[in-house]
């Protein structure tokens, strides 16, 4: 499986000056946990990290120190995540048929989750890891913040990554979005807008996206528990 990891990760909400993916988490940079888990998935055979030029040296060194069993390639990203993913798709080897896309900030995804998503692509043309919503969701008027209605949660799932699909179709979807100035927050949404079915793959409750300092504390606690159970990360 070919894997793209968007890793721009500006740390404004973390209170960090640089890339939040280079912040320490349980003794190693946050991105190192993401890479290690991805490389441990048996089907992973190629990883492309998409980032900004100012982070290239640090990320290259990080990947080198990990000594991963799969090749890791650097891809210069664009101004937005969507542009960066498109650049990543264009940089894939010509033999790539399916691709997974995983946010670098989701550093707790397990190798098993990568494998489930890769296996699903043998059957479905587009997939997204997701978990059922547990909270009650309120739709709110934006100006007054008054509740408009409560949305039944039985059919609601919280999207995660990995997401992925057929390389040709994803390239076409991103090219279409660029031409039409369509902006989305994840790759599955592009497939949806193009009328393509997207299959949900059961995600993981621990697969949180590190966005705030509180997320970092939660991730630290989860990792400590996991490392006690299995000391080899």
UniProtKB/Swiss-Prot annotation:
The record marks 13, 20 as: Transition state stabilizer. Disulfide bonds: none annotated. InterPro entries: IspD, IspD/TarI, IspD/TarI_cytidylyltransf_bact, ISPD_synthase_CS, Nucleotide-diphossugar_trans. Keywords: Isoprene biosynthesis, Nucleotidyltransferase, Transferase. Its EC number is 2.7.7.60. Pfam families: IspD (PF01128). It comes from the Bacteria. GO terms for molecular function: 2-C-methyl-D-erythritol 4-phosphate cytidylyltransferase activity. SUPFAM superfamilies: Nucleotide-diphospho-sugar transferases. Gene3D superfamilies: Spore Coat Polysaccharide Biosynthesis Protein SpsA, Chain A. It is an enzyme of class 2 (transferase). One of its GO terms (biological process) is isopentenyl diphosphate biosynthetic process, methylerythritol 4-phosphate pathway. Pathway: Isoprenoid biosynthesis; isopentenyl diphosphate biosynthesis via DXP pathway; isopentenyl diphosphate from 1-deoxy-D-xylulose 5-phosphate: step 2/6. The keyword Nucleotidyltransferase applies. The record marks 153, 209 as: Positions MEP for the nucleophilic attack. It catalyses: 2-C-methyl-D-erythritol 4-phosphate + CTP + H(+) = 4-CDP-2-C-methyl-D-erythritol + diphosphate. PROSITE patterns: ISPD (PS01295). The keyword Nucleotidyltransferase applies. Catalyzes the formation of 4-diphosphocytidyl-2-C-methyl-D-erythritol from CTP and 2-C-methyl-D-erythritol 4-phosphate (MEP). Belongs to the IspD/TarI cytidylyltransferase family. IspD subfamily. This is 2-C-methyl-D-erythritol 4-phosphate cytidylyltransferase. The lineage of its organism: Bacteria, Bacillati, Cyanobacteriota, Cyanophyceae, Gloeobacterales. The gene is ispD.
């Amino acid at each position: 499986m070919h894997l793209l990891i968007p890793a721009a990760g500006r740390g404004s909400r973390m209170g960090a000056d640089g890339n939040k993916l280079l912040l320490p988490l349980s003794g190693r940079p946050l991105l190192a946990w993401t890479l290690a888990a991805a490389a441990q998935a048996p089907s992973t055979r190629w990883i492309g990290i998409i980032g900004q030029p100012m982070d290239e040296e640090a990320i290259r060194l990080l990947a080198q120190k990990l000594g991963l069993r799969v090749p890791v390639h650097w891809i210069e990203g664009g101004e937005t995540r969507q542009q960066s993913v498109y650049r990543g798709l264009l940089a894939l080897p010509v033999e790539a048929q399916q691709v997974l896309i995983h946010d670098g900030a989701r550093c707790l995804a397990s190798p098993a989750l990568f494998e489930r998503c890769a296996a699903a692509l043998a059957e479905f043309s587009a997939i997204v890891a997701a978990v059922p919503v547990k909270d009650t969701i309120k739709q709110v008027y934006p100006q007054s913040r008054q509740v408009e209605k409560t949305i039944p949660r039985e059919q609601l799932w919280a999207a995660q990554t990995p997401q992925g699909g057929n390389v040709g179709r994803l390239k076409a979807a991103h090219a279409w979005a660029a031409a039409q100035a369509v902006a989305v927050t994840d790759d599955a949404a592009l497939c949806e807008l193009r009328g393509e079915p997207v299959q949900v793959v059961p995600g993981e409750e621990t697969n949180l996206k590190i966005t705030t300092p509180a997320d970092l504390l939660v991730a630290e606690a989860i990792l400590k528990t996991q490392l006690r159970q299995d000391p080899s990360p």
